[in-house]
Amino acid sequence: IDDESTDNTWKIIYNTIYDHPRKNKVRVCAKNRNRIGVLANHYKMAQMCSDNEVIVNLDGDDELAHKDVLNVLSNVYDTSDIWMTYGSFAYDYESRNPDPNADPRGISGPFPADKHERTYFFVCSHLRTYKKWLFSKIRLEDLKRDGDFYQLAMDHALMFPMIEMSGPDHAKYIHDILYLYNAVNVLNEHTLVGREMVMEV
């Protein structure tokens, strides 16, 4: 889904997929006429998945860390009774890393077995994946405020209820870097932290 981009993204994606030999493996769903936000788009896309399919959250300005990421995830879900996974990601600063000696690893980390609740510091970040049926158990009203989908902190709105439902036996933290987070995009939430984001959380 293209959320009303203004930089020719839609045309580039459409043409790239149309000319690709495996274009039958990709569905280009829609270009929104009005921007509706990340969480609303995630909800919209999830309705197109079957219950046992695994949803992988990848933002358009980020990328998977390597070509075997989906194989890693497939192995996790195929060999254990896992309902959701999270982690791990690295910040991609491109050419303007403010501290070249800084650890690029993001905030994802294992949830203590006795702390599967939303009072614990949020560590369930990229790469986020989950079974569609688990996502469907989140009440729609819990993804909204005053009738509208949350515009910020959508990862909290999604992951807290799912990790509570999964518990330590069915949620898995993956230590290996699977995701590269574009840290130079001025529209990223971590650059927009302020009163609005605090209210959303």
Residue ranges, per PLM feature:
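Nucleotide-sugar donor-binding/catalytic module of glycosyltransferases
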Residues: 1-201
